[in-house]
């Protein structure tokens, strides 16, 4: 299966694990069609869980709000300390109350974690943003490759 997304070239942020084809779209010199050939890996395409599973070794399933519990059941290390590369699980604030939200810790600076995630603001959008380390929305972390 191939998913297609059209974005300005300045907005395209592509995982190094993705197989990507970029070609000019007829009549629009500054726009491109980006075809992602990532695999579903058992998650719904373009959800936060799907995005994280494309970039980390995820051997469990479930909605984002069950990931820490499910990772523990799969004998993965979990905890409350942020580490670059860890998966971070969030509960309600701006996040979907029923499904939860997950992202990847891309950095730690000045009392914040830098989170890389998908669908935080808009559907299909990858964001990089700061979240205070002591935010009550952070449920914890999963430490996997």
List where the protein language model places each region.
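Secreted/periplasmic proteins that engage bacterial cell-wall peptidoglycan
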Residues: 15-118
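Compositionally biased, intrinsically disordered low-complexity regions enriched in proline and serine
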Residues: 6, 33, 52, 142-144
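N-terminal secretion targeting segments of exported proteins
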Residues: 1-19, 144-145
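Aromatic- and glycine-rich peptidoglycan recognition patches
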Residues: 108-145
């Amino acid at each position: 299966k191939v998913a297609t997304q059209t974005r300005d070239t300045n907005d395209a942020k592509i995982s190094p694990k993705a197989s990507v084809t970029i070609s000019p779209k007829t009549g629009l010199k500054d726009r491109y069609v980006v075809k992602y050939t990532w695999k579903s890996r058992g998650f719904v395409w373009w959800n936060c869980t799907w995005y994280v599973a494309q970039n980390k070794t995820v051997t469990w399933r479930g909605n984002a709000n069950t990931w820490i519990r499910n990772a523990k059941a799969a004998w993965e290390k979990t905890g409350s300390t942020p580490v670059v590369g860890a998966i971070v699980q969030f509960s309600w604030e701006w996040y979907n109350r029923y499904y939860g939200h997950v992202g990847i810790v891309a950095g730690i600076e000045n009392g914040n974690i830098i989170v890389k995630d998908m669908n935080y603001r808009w559907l299909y959008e990858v964001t990089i943003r700061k979240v205070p380390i002591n935010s009550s929305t952070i449920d914890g972390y999963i430490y996997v490759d």
